[in-house]
């Protein structure tokens, strides 16, 4: 299981600059027939905020309906302590009733319509299809959107990919500078970058960078491979997004 904030660094920049000389001429995979994929789609941000009042029954039902995500969301994404269903329902109600969280949710609803989320799921399914074409298996079965309270942009597990929509509200969103995110980072916090971040996040979940091996060249090679993987999985992606 992996959690990712949005990462943009000098190693990726330099390695991708070296790759750009052939990228436009040699984008792989563009003409292959799509492989069939089977996925479920969960707009958990809508599920969570649609309840008038969160009850223990909601907690039990969500835990049973979404076993691949609910406990992960509660314990790892919004960091609520372990509790019984009654106490957890109370904690979740406090979360969705918090003024700041309500403001974030309102902005998410403004930026992302339900149709926008469907389009996002479709784009990720193309990535999964390309992955299956190249590597023979479909990596995950569940695609999820959620509100993370600015904790995570992308999460991956052995069965799911999730997107924290509140990390993609646009570079003009006033929330980001107010919580100390630097401008060079939040200038990429828009929906245009979601698919790229999902693919890069998945690559990082399968290929950890060696933290003990901090040589400049080694990291350039790592991020160059990540760039190439992303270009294979999304051959139509604009270079400005790939290198962002």
Report each predicted region and the residues it spans:
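N-terminal mature-domain "stem" immediately C-terminal to a signal peptide or N-terminal signal-anchor/transmembrane
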Residues: 25-94
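Acidic/His-rich structured neighborhood in mature extracellular/periplasmic domains
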Residues: 93-244
């Amino acid at each position: 299981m992996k959690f990712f904030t949005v990462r943009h660094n000098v190693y990726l920049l330099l390695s991708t600059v070296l790759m750009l000389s052939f990228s436009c001429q040699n984008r792989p995979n563009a003409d292959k027939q799509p492989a069939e994929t089977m996925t479920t789609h969960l707009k958990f941000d809508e599920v969570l905020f649609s309840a008038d009042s969160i009850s223990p029954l909601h907690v039990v039902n969500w835990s049973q309906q979404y076993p691949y995500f609910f406990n992960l969301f509660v314990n790892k994404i919004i960091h609520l302590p372990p509790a019984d269903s009654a106490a957890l329902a109370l904690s979740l109600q406090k979360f969705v009733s918090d003024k700041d969280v309500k403001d974030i949710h309102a902005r998410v609803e403004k930026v992302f319509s339900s149709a926008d989320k469907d389009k996002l799921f479709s784009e990720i399914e193309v990535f999964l299809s390309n992955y299956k074409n190249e590597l023979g298996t479909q990596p995950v079965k569940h695609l999820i959107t959620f509100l993370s309270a600015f904790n995570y942009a992308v999460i991956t597990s052995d069965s799911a990919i999730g997107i924290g929509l509140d990390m993609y509200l646009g570079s003009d969103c006033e929330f980001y500078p107010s919580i100390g995110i630097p401008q060079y980072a939040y200038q990429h916090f828009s929906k245009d970058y979601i698919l790229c971040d999902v693919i890069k996040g998945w690559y990082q979940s399968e290929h950890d960078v060696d933290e003990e091996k901090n040589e400049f060249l080694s990291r350039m090679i790592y991020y160059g491979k990540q760039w190439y993987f992303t270009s294979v999985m999304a051959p139509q992606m604009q270079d400005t997004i790939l290198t962002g």
